């Protein structure tokens, strides 16, 4: 604004950023443009000439794509020309300004405001394409002989491009009419779900260029057909927690569901499975190889990892039931790491997780002209805005369970003042005399069944190993640490055994916005209206952990 008489102007936040004119980038055949965009900022990319793809999904000509909070690469087989320009500042929900998540959002000095961008001539895309053609040959053989299609397990260290390879192979398969099942076994990032989940999805249509894997069902239109993921909750940071005692059974349950789907769907059986794994399994830590063995048995890049895989699995027979009477063999192939793979620090990954959770409840705030064109919308841009339903619940009416596993990298303090307001610990005998013997026995049973190594109730539950499942029911009053965390609503009954709760798939997620321990109520956000179904609920206390600022 101007100061009268002095012809001076005061800078304002609205005038600080002046977008640079669009930049044209010409790529020769076999090269790719690599770029990084911070959260809270956006760039727009348009394909002016030639052909190009992002992680295997082809870009439409003359359509503008918007990217925010991503590290990606656009590859061309025959050469192309791109136009890159600065996008609008992303306004997040409830006053988290243009700075984005975790204080990020600094616009860079690259084309369109990229934090980093450059053109690379050497890429491993030819290797990835050769893998696709080899898989296609195996799929054609599977169709001719009636066998199962190839099952691909992708292993490698952190930030090696495993998920990128999975996207490329999936995109190429769908492009030729195949229908692969993609399995995500990495709880650090969600695939069509929130972090802390293990998912399996059958891909029948193209993936979304701007959103990666695409989107799951929602109450609204979608330019790209939605995907239907099968979701299991694993509220721990990595598979090695509790020596894999929780991770392995969930993987087995997920593999059983995938096997059942393939038995009923001829197209997915012929196409096969693509499994993406966490990088920590390839770091050589104790217990990693056992979990890899388990994954190979159920679903069946470093030199040391490659040598171990060659020694243990190359040309060895598979263990699947369908291969029992055949001569199927496991083949180990080493792929080059792309030079575009960059390290994703803890702050960036935290922003990724918060963005996935925010998108689950509130939709995608990034305006997209490409989606508007695909959806035949009258507006020039479109963004998907969802309205979650807020409601208060009596904590007493909920069956909330929590995994009682000490973190491997820190000693967690379980102290919560709300648990000691009306405690009966200091009464004679440490127990309320008004309680009957039935209540005492129920509490003893609950405690015994939640601690590994202690004898649980006899019968079927004991036989199934329920006493070894480190799940404990959270008793009233509601702990204050419940605020700003996720609750996973399972498909099993609230009084189910710990093993049944652990192995149950997920119906949906709730976000705890506030906790009133005195009144025994919690305020939650739900993706749909109506009463919360009477199901067992698992608390994501340890992972994905606390998400602050989702609501005001």
From Swiss-Prot:
Localization (cell): Nucleus
Keywords: ATP-binding, mRNA processing, Nucleotide-binding, Nucleus
InterPro entries: Clp1 (IPR028606), Clp1/Grc3 (IPR045116), Clp1_C (IPR010655), Clp1_C_sf (IPR038238), Clp1_N (IPR032324), Clp1_N_sf (IPR038239), CLP1_P (IPR032319), P-loop_NTPase (IPR027417)
Residue stretches of biased makeup (Low complexity): 459-468
Positions bound to ATP: 32, 71, 159-164
GO cellular component, one term: mRNA cleavage factor complex
An example Gene Ontology molecular-function term: ATP binding
Sequence ranges of Basic and acidic residues compositional bias: 432-444
Pfam families: Clp1, CLP1_N, CLP1_P
Keyword Membrane included in the entry's annotation: no
GO annotation (BP), single: tRNA splicing, via endonucleolytic cleavage and ligation
Major localisation: nucleus
Region Disordered, residue ranges: 409-470
Family: Belongs to the Clp1 family. Clp1 subfamily.
Quaternary structure and interacting proteins, as annotated: Component of a pre-mRNA cleavage factor complex. Interacts directly with PCF11.
PANTHER family: CLEAVAGE/POLYADENYLATION FACTOR IA SUBUNIT CLP1P (PTHR12755), POLYRIBONUCLEOTIDE 5'-HYDROXYL-KINASE CLP1 (PTHR12755:SF6)
Job description of the protein: Required for endonucleolytic cleavage during polyadenylation-dependent pre-mRNA 3'-end formation.
HAMAP family in alphabetical order: Clp1
Protein name: mRNA cleavage and polyadenylation factor clp1
Lineage: Eukaryota, Fungi, Dikarya, Ascomycota, Pezizomycotina
């Amino acid at each position: 604004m101007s100061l009268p008489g002095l012809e001076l102007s005061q800078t304002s936040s609205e005038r600080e950023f002046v977008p640079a004119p669009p930049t044209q980038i010409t790529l020769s055949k076999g090269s790719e443009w690599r770029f990084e965009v911070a959260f809270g900022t956006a760039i727009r990319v348009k394909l002016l000439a030639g052909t190009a793809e992002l992680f295997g999904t082809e870009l439409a000509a003359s359509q503008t794509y918007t990217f925010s909070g991503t590290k990606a690469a656009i590859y061309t087989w025959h050469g192309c020309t791109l136009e890159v320009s600065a996008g609008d500042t992303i306004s997040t929900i409830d006053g988290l300004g243009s700075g984005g998540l975790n204080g990020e959002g600094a616009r860079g000095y690259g084309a369109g405001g990229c934090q980093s961008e450059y053109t690379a001539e050497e890429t491993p895309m030819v290797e990835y394409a050769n893998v696709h053609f080899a898989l296609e040959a195996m799929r054609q053989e599977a169709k001719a002989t009636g066998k199962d299609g190839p099952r691909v397990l992708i292993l490698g260290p952190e930030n090696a491009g495993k998920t990128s390879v999975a996207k490329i192979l999936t995109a190429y398969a769908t492009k030729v009419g195949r229908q692969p099942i993609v399995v995500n076994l990495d709880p650090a990032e969600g695939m069509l779900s929130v972090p802390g989940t293990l998912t399996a999805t059958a891909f029948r249509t193209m993936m979304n260029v701007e959103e990666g894997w695409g989107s799951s069902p929602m109450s609204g239109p979608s330019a790209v057909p939605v995907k239907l993921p099968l979701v299991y909750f694993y509220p721990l940071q990595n598979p090695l927690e509790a020596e894999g005692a929780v991770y392995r059974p969930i993987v087995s349950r997920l593999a059983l569901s995938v096997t059942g789907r393939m038995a009923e769907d001829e197209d997915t059986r012929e196409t096969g499975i693509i499994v993406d794994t966490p990088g920590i399994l390839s770091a050589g830590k104790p217990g990693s190889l056992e979990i890899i063995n388990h994954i190979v048995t159920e679903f069946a890049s470093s030199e040391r990892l490659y040598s171990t895989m060659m020694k243990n699995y190359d040309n060895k027979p598979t263990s699947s039931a369908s291969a029992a009477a055949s001569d199927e063999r496991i083949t180990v192939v080493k792929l080059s790491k792309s030079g575009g793979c960059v390290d994703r620090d803890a702050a960036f990954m935290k922003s990724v997780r918060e963005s996935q959770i925010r998108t689950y409840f509130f939709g995608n705030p990034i305006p997209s002209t490409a989606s508007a064109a695909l959806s035949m919308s009258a507006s020039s841009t479109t963004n998907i805005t969802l309205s979650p339903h807020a409601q208060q619940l009596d904590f007493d009416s909920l069956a909330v369970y929590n995994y009682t596993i000490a973190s491997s990298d820190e000693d967690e303090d379980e102290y919560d003042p709300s648990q000691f307001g009306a405690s009966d610990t200091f009464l004679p005998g440490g127990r309320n005399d008004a309680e009957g013997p039935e209540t005492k026995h129920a509490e003893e049973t609950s405690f015994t069944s939640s601690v590994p190594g202690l004898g649980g109730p006899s019968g079927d539950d004991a036989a199934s190993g329920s006493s070894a499942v480190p799940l404990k029911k959270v008793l009233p009053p509601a702990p204050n640490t419940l605020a700003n965390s996720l609750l996973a609503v399972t498909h099993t009954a609230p009084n189910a055994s710990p093993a049944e709760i652990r192995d149950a798939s997920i119906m949906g997620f709730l976000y705890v916005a506030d906790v009133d321990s005195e009144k025994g109520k919690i305020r939650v956000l739900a993706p749909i209206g109506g009463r919360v179904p009477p199901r067992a609920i698992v608390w994501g206390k340890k992972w994905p952990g606390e998400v602050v600022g989702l609501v005001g």
